[in-house]
């Protein structure tokens, strides 16, 4: 049976596993990224994962999803934030192919998550899919007819940096922004709060927590509306850990979009939450690999 190694490199953890020729995840594992140790360390960890699978038998390829800005044609990272030192310039495709003589492809993690949703998740069958991941920051991707829209310099849909009246989109509508707002409202340290606690206390009647959620949703709705006016997606898919609170967030976000978009656009723009959770990066990396290698 033909198998592919799929690796999803995040700032906290590296998820990896085997995907078979039918696109099914056969097994999956997780290891700490140790991002503070930098790009060379992450590259070596990736090589160790590939080597461990090759010891058990042949693989048809290595599909990688990674944080940072990725040039999928060169197969390398061309920009990464300070959270992962010396990551920019890491040549995954070249290093993996030269070390193991197997084909390798790499793509940005949010693009991979969006591709997974467009191919086999909440966006299946849609012509234009906008996918946003809400977490520490906000990442975005646009999938058009099953293809990732990269833009001229592989920087399309970096919506977290989008300027809004009160600051950058991700500084207003991310999980980080929510936690910081609620902590400040309570006069407490940020470390005392997280998304899970905020939603729990909001449902128990904590007005400051609900106020923080409503504030985040308001900014999220405005940012989403701006993107929808430009891209006119058929479906908007929201992912990230905090979107697990779908029962609370979905009606609020739907209302925010309805209040911000013109009626004709609001009626025709479908809002969904991500179907694939922890496996999205690996599945999307596999779909990207198959497209690049076809």
PLM regions and their residue ranges:
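Hydrophobic "anchor" residues
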Residues: 25, 77, 148-149
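Glycine-rich phosphate-binding loop of actin/hexokinase-like ATP-binding domains
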Residues: 124-176
